[in-house]
Amino acid sequence: MEVLQLWSDRVVLEITERSEVGANFSWEGALERVKAMGFQIAVDDLGSGYAALNMLAELQPHFMKVDMSIVRNVDKDEHKRRLVDLLCSFAEATDSEVVAEGVETDEEAAALADAGVDLMQGYLYGEPSLTLTA
C-alpha cells in the first residue's frame, strides 16, 4: 500500500451480486482480513441477481449499490420506490450507505433523495471517463 501511495480507508472494494465463488470459499475469513486492512466493502448491482439478502447478511457491506434496473423510472413505479425505501431503512439500521446507480433524470434523483439514498451516480451527473480526477 505504501509503495502505491494508497490509503486503504479511501478504497472501496466492490463485490457484484452476480459474482460466483466456489462452494468452499468463505467470505467471512477473506472479509475479516480486508476490513482489518482498512478497506471498505460495497455490494454492487444490488437487485440484479438471486442471492442479494444472503450476500448482505454475509458481507455486512459499508455500501449497497442499487442496480440501475431498480433506479430506472423509480419516480413513476411505486413498487420500485417502496423497495428503495426498504433498502434505505435496512441500510440505516446496519450502518451502511445506499448508492443509486444509473441515475439519468432529475425526477429519479428527487425520488431517490426522498427515499433516503445517500449517494447517486449516473449520466445525470456525468459520463464515464477514463481520466482520473481527485
Q: Where does each model-flagged region fall?
A:
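Alpha-helix C-terminal capping segments
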Residues: 3-5, 34, 131-134
